[in-house]
Curated annotation (Swiss-Prot):
Name of the gene: lolA
GO cellular component: outer membrane-bounded periplasmic space
Pfam short name (any one): LolA
Lineage: Bacteria, Pseudomonadati, Pseudomonadota, Gammaproteobacteria, Pasteurellales
Subunit organization: Monomer.
NCBIfam families, per the entry: lolA
UniProt name for this protein: Outer-membrane lipoprotein carrier protein
Organism, as annotated: Pasteurella multocida (strain Pm70)
Length: 205
């Protein structure tokens, strides 16, 4: 009898947890869908696992629903992350290298693309919890490099900040400023490999 009670309690707990995750994910997607286009500057703070600030940075963010995303990091080192909806490009001018991944394969390690995604297969890779205006996403795959992705967005769809916590405990916080919602051309989210730059094409693997 006790075993049966324990099993029933465990199943009920699992069911309620799954329902809570589904509700939180639905609420987050609903809030994100309220803003179709966004441009902003961001201030980045990188902190070690013990909470010490180890680096400050800045850059610009552009998103356009559905599935278009661009981050241009300006300081302390230039790099770009661009999603054209199918391919996620990571360009590091310093080492003259571009890495290309299919978006569907990159979501697990690059949750930024969820900010513009309405693809259920992308969202299915994360459990989502909500506490007021902060949503915490945790990847289901154990091999993910990301431990946690937090998004702070209000009920009107205004994105305030987001952060990642990596497996080693390092935190990357991005605080948005100078937010505008002016139209953006799709061409902004296109990427061509610069001449002389090495392409690491993970789409072929």
């Amino acid at each position: 009898m006790n075993n049966m009670l324990l099993k029933t309690t465990a199943l009920l707990t699992l069911f309620l947890s799954s329902a809570a995750w589904a509700d939180a994910a639905s609420e987050l997607q609903q809030r994100l869908s309220k803003v179709n286009v966004l441009s902003a500057d961001y201030a980045q703070t990188v902190s070690s696992s013990d909470g010490k600030n180890v680096q400050q940075g800045s850059g610009t963010l552009k998103i356009k629903r559905p599935n278009l995303f661009r981050m241009d990091n300006k300081t302390p080192q230039e790099n770009q992350i661009i999603s054209d909806g199918k391919t996620l490009w990571f360009y590091d001018p310093f080492v003259e290298q571009v890495t290309a991944n299919w978006v569907k394969d990159a979501v697990n390690n690059t949750p930024f693309v969820l900010l513009t995604s309405d693809d259920s297969s992308h969202w299915a890779q994360y459990n989502v919890e909500q506490k007021a205006d902060t949503f915490t996403l945790k990847p289901k795959a154990k091999q993910s490099n990301i431990k946690q992705f937090d998004i702070r967005i209000d009920s009107e769809g205004v994105l305030r900040n987001f952060s990642t916590i990596e497996k080693d405990g390092q935190t990357n916080l991005y605080i948005l400023r100078n937010i505008t919602n002016q139209p953006l051309a799709d061409g902004i989210f296109k990427f061509s490999v610069p001449k002389g730059v090495e392409l690491d094409d993970q789409r072929q693997k």
